[in-house]
Amino acid sequence: MQVHFLTKNFGKYDTSSIGSYMNVGGFEALRKAVTMDPEKITDLLTKVKIKGRGGAEYPLGRKWSQARAVRGERKVVICNADEGETTTFKDRELICHDPFNLSEAMIIAAYVVGASDGFIYMRAEYACYRPLLLNAIRQAKNYGFLGTNILGRGFDFDIHLYSGAGAYVCGEGTALIRSIEGKAGRPRMKPPFIKVSGVFARPTCLNNVETLSLVPHLLLDDAGVYASCGSGESIGTKLISVAGNVNRPGVFEIPFGTTVREILYDLAGGIQHDRKIQLIQFGGASGKIADASILDTPYTYEDLRAAGVMVGSGGMLVIDERTSVLDFLRMNQEFFWEESCGQCTPCREGNLHIKIILDKMAAGTATREDIAIMIKIARVMSMSSLCGLGETAQNTLMSAMKVFPDLFDIGGARA
């Protein structure tokens, strides 16, 4: 079933008017937050076990506590709105349908961690939503929710909107920061970690759109009721985007524990023309794949992990029987070959050579040795690449080897 906690404001107010937002309770969470000790807010987030919704699953309360504890002046909070993962478009819906909530969430984050500046880093392809966020920021300033001495609490904070240039790798934290600084969007070595030295060498706290957008709702609504959704490691609700060969692709808010079957057949309307499922990719291009045997698995962090896939970015791509697994793998690999920034050798060369071997498989000229080399390259990439792009680029391929082993069983004639 679909629920409306994070999405409860969708369609309820005029997204161009702060007054309309305030009529549905807008900025009441901020008013409440500035009367609370910041530690009380992080304690609440820790108590309800909120994890980051960007894919890393890092506990939000712990992240904000660590950011607050870092010494340094002029701290920064960043909203990662560079939603570049393929088949993932849930954050776009939050920006489009609830822009003032995102602004409010960033102000609360700044209050908690002690930041004076914020950046929203928006992917280039979302340029049409830039005026919507700029308007929300401008009106928040006019009403005294941004600027100096916010709500008379001696708290100063401003938000700056920055658009990327279309590079997938800028979804990675350090590459995103270098892009904001006006440099080439390429990852850097860690440490120093960005919580200590991030944008312009200032302590930085980075969260994605969905993670931030949860906070105002948790402060105003009964966090205990929210925490009663889901179980174990997976608390609350999750925004997911479903794409591919389904009848009703779109974004849905589900309670953790909803089965994959319920998502695809009850919410997304089933597979087009009742065709068979060839594969489902979870978490975008860097995610893993499964076949139809996963349908009755609950959508939770732990259950999907046990099934060999992951929540990741919250994207689900459904491919029906008309598309061959090999063609899908080649398309996925082409994406990483094009999007690698080229800075580190394992990712730059590894993606190219995996692409070459997959093309040889399609042409019927691959050998057993080619398959062995491809596996070795994939493992080296996962262990030695500079950033998450190279580390996870082989996830789809390696999971396909487990789900479709016959595809990689090259006959002895070409060995």
How would you describe each model-predicted region?
Residues 28-44, 73-75, 81, 90-95, ...:
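Ferredoxin-type iron-sulfur electron-transfer modules in oxidoreductases and energy-metabolism complexes
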Residues 98-112:
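Histidine-anchored nucleotide/phosphate-binding helix
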Residues 105-109, 256-274:
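Short amphipathic, charge-patterned alpha-helical segments
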Residues 1-42:
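Cofactor-/ligand-binding subdomain signature composed of acidic, glycine-rich
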Residues 56, 62-64, 88-91, 130-135, ...:
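Short acidic, glycine/serine/threonine-rich loops at helix termini
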